[in-house]
Structure formats: C-alpha cells, structure tokens
Amino acid sequence: MMTLNFATQVRQMKAIAGQPDYALGSVHAVTREGTLFIASASGSQLASYAWGAANVIFVVGAQKLVPTRDAARERIFQHSLKLEDARALVAYGQHSSIGKILEIDREQPGRTHIVLIQQTVGF
C-alpha cells in the first residue's frame, strides 16, 4: 500500500485496507454480556473489524470491562475520549472527536478472538 498515491489511488488503498487477512486492535469497552464497543473519529479501522478482515484479534485491558451498554458509552465519552483528545492535541495539534461507534454483539464462530490482559492497555 505504501507504493500507492493517496491523491490518485485512494479507492485501491481503501479496498486493500478494508479486506486484510488479519486485523489487530483493541476496543474501548466490553460489557458483561460480551458486547464490544469501538469508537473512532474517522471510522477507518472499523470496516475491517466489522466485516472486512477474515480474522480479528483484540487485545483488551481488564480495565475496559463494564457492566452495561450505558456504562460502555459513558466510558467512551467520559474516559477514552478525554485521554485521546489530550494525546491528539500533543501529537497533531488538534482535538479528537468520536465520529462513529461500532458495537459488536455477535460474530461468526472463530473469526474474532479476545486476549484479555490484566495490564492497562490503551484508553
């Protein structure tokens, strides 16, 4: 993908990025029932998580476990966004925002794997 020109080949870049064999990432919250919540400013990573990738692996810190969907949304807006906003301001000189939130309730058997760790990872 690095050899493609963003100005003239953005469609090809999106096609490649949206259909990888594997997607590795994290989530912002996991409910007691197992619903995964992933927030994004642009949504660029969400397509592969939701459908495009053949296999998805999420590494999730135990601090992201919450009891309910409402608690997951509250965690995203009151915790994750605040930390990401501060990081983006230093890194890019601009504020962050949440443009999209993906909720995953059910998945094809064997497609998505969660690695739950005790270490604090991400926001």
Enumerate the language-model features and the residues they cover.
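Conserved phosphate- and dinucleotide-binding cores of soluble alpha/beta proteins
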Residues: 17-123
